[in-house]
Amino acid sequence: MIKYLPRLIVILLLASFTLYGSLKSFYNNKIKIEAFTYEVKPNTSILDLYDGIYESNNLFEKSLFLLGIYLFDFRTIQAGEYLIDDNLFKVLTKMKLGETITYKFVISDGTNKFDLSLYIDSLKLNNDCEDFSCIDLVNDSIEGLLLPDTYFFKSNTNLSLLLNKSSSELKSYVDMIWRDKPIDNPLKSKYEGIILASIIEKESSSIDEKMKIGGVFLNRLKIKMRLQADPTIIYGLMPDFNGDITKQDLRDKNNLYNTYVIESLPPTPISMPTRSSLDAAITNSPNEYLFFVADGKGKHIFSKTYNEHLEYVNLYQKK
C-alpha cells in the first residue's frame, strides 16, 4: 500500500488542480452572447434553468454547471426577471439573492391622460387599472391626481400599486402645503389649487417664474377676471389639437376648458402639476401683475396694465 502512496498523491493533486481549474472557469467565464432578459418561473429547478439558458448557447458543460451549483450553493434560486449580461457566477448570485431587473415608471412633469396612457402601454406592467379605474377620478379626469416623479417596479407589477402610491404622495403634499395658504389667496379648495397648479405647470418650467405666473392668476381670480390661459384651450381640444389656436378656438363656448370664455377655473386640472407648481398656486399670494407674454427665449414679460401688455406683445410676438 505504501509503495502506491506517491502515485495516489499525484492523482489527488492532479484532481485538485483539475477541480480548481474547473471552478475558476465557472467563476470567471464570461457569457459570450448579447445580453438578454430571462424570466425564472416559480419552482424552476436548476436543470430547467440550465436547459432554458445555457444548454442552447453551448456555454457550459452540464457537469461543470452542476458542480459549480453545488459547490457554490446555488441550489435555491428565486423567481423573477433577470438580466443575463455577465459571467455565470454573477448571474446565479443574482438569482440566489433575488436581484431581479428593476424598471422605471416616470410620470413626467405636466403630462396628461393621453400621453400617460400611451406610456403605460409600453411598460412591463400588469394593467389592472384600465382607464385609471383604480383611482377615484374627479369628472373622469386623472390629471392632477398623480404626482410627477420616478417610481420603480419589477416586471408584471400591478399598475394600481404605482398609481395609488403616486396619488397618495400627491394628496399628502397638497394637505401639507394647504396649511400654509395665505389669507389673501382666493382659492376655495385643495382641488381648485391643483387645477390652478396644472395651468401654471403648462405655462412655464421655470420655478422662479412659476411663483410670478401663479401670482398673476391669483390676482385675476381675486378680481374675477378671466384667466385667458392658452394651455386650457389646448387641453379642451385634445386629442385632436393640431398645433394652432385660432380665433374661433378663443371664442368657442363649447370648449369647457376655454378660459377665454368661462369666468373662473376649468372643471378639472389639465396636467400633472409638480410640487413647484402646487407651491405657486397654493402657498402664493396675488401680485401686482395681470398680464404676461412669452419673450421668445423661454421666459415671460409681466405687465400691470393692458396697454403695457399690448406693447410687449407687439415687441416680442409680432416681430
Q: Predicted regions: what is each one?
A:
Residues 193-194, 255-259, 291-292:
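Short acidic (Asp/Glu) and glycine-rich catalytic loops that position anionic groups and cofactors
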Residues 1-238, 269-276, 280-288, 295-319:
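Conserved catalytic or metal-liganding residues and their short signature motifs at active sites
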Residues 228-270:
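Conserved SxxK-family serine transpeptidase/carboxypeptidase catalytic domain
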